[in-house]
Structures are given as structure tokens and as C-alpha cells.
């Protein structure tokens, strides 16, 4: 895990383009080559999608997803697969963009999380710009939504889409 995190930090440090991590995470290339991501994107709803990603994430990365669901919220916390190892900014940003991008592509809706928080300050503004919400500094690397995600700030039923996630209520 530590070597993977250093690898990502080196990419961030050497890239002259600050938008490169956002483009990488939102490109869709990962879902084309990753069976767990493809399977998750073919889930009947966002909750199942996130649970499947959490189940298989250890196979494709050095971090874990902790998915929590209440009556009003669905959240994903990013946790290092190695206890005590803090996630670098680039990994938190890429994972947030990846998760929101996956839901957007599957639903064909401009979904926006209600909040995003990171343990370390996130200096690259492109992550927050992609998400549509600021990334605040907090005690966890966490993406939170009410219900699932909001669309244009209004409550609205999910219209059928060509993607796999079709039964998605929005707040």
C-alpha cells in the first residue's frame, strides 16, 4: 500500500497538468479493464453498486471502501488497506471523482454528492469542481449523500437510462 501511495504522489508531483488526476479518474478506462468495477456499474442501484465496489476494492487497490447507509444518508469512507497509513491527496481526489463519475455515467444524470471531506487539505481545486461541492477538511476521507445524490439541487425520480443503475432516487 505504501509503495502504491508513493507512486500516486510521484505522478501528482511530476504532472505539469493539475487536472490530470481528474481526467484519469473520470475517463472510464478503469471500468473497461476492471471486472469488479464493471460488475458494480451493472448493479440495480447505487447502494448495491457501492457495496459491490467495497467488497471487491481490495482486489484492485490499496484502499478499502466502508459503505454506510441510513434512512437519510449513503456514505463511502476511504480507508487505507494498511492500518495507520494515511491516504495521499491524489488518491482521495481520484477515488471521489471515480465514484461520482461512475454514478453519473451509469445514470446519465449530473449527480452531485451532498458533501465531501478529507483528512488532509485538498489543494487541487479540480476535484471539488468535478464533484460540484467543496472538499472540507475533516476526520475522515468521506463522500456523503442524502438518499443517494442530488440532481440540480431538487428532489426528483431517476429517469430510465442506458446505464446499468436504473432505480436511483435522488435528493
Predicted feature locations:
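Extended mid-to-C-terminal alpha-helical interaction segments
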Residues: 121-171
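Generic recognition of short, well-ordered alpha-helical interface segments
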Residues: 3-6, 48, 94, 157, ...
Amino acid at each position: 500500500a505504501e509503495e502504491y501511495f508513493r507512486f500516486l504522489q510521484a505522478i501528482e508531483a511530476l504532472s505539469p497538468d493539475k487536472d490530470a488526476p481528474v481526467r484519469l479518474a473520470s475517463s472510464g478506462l478503469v471500468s473497461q479493464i476492471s471486472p469488479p468495477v464493471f460488475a458494480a456499474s451493472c448493479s440495480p442501484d447505487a447502494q448495491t453498486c457501492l457495496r459491490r465496489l467495497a467488497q471487491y476494492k481490495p482486489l484492485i487497490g490499496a484502499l478499502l471502501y466502508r459503505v454506510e447507509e441510513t434512512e437519510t444518508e449513503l456514505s463511502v469512507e476511504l480507508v487505507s488497506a494498511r492500518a495507520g497509513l494515511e491516504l495521499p491527496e491524489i488518491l482521495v481526489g481520484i477515488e471521489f471523482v471515480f465514484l461520482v463519475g461512475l454514478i453519473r455515467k451509469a445514470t446519465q444524470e449530473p449527480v452531485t454528492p451532498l458533501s465531501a471531506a478529507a483528512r488532509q487539505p485538498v489543494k487541487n481545486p479540480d476535484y471539488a469542481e468535478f464533484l460540484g461541492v467543496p472538499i472540507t477538511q475533516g476526520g475522515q476521507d468521506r463522500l456523503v449523500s442524502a438518499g443517494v445524490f442530488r440532481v440540480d439541487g431538487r428532489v426528483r425520480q431517476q429517469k430510465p437510462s442506458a446505464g446499468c443503475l436504473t432505480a436511483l432516487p435522488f435528493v
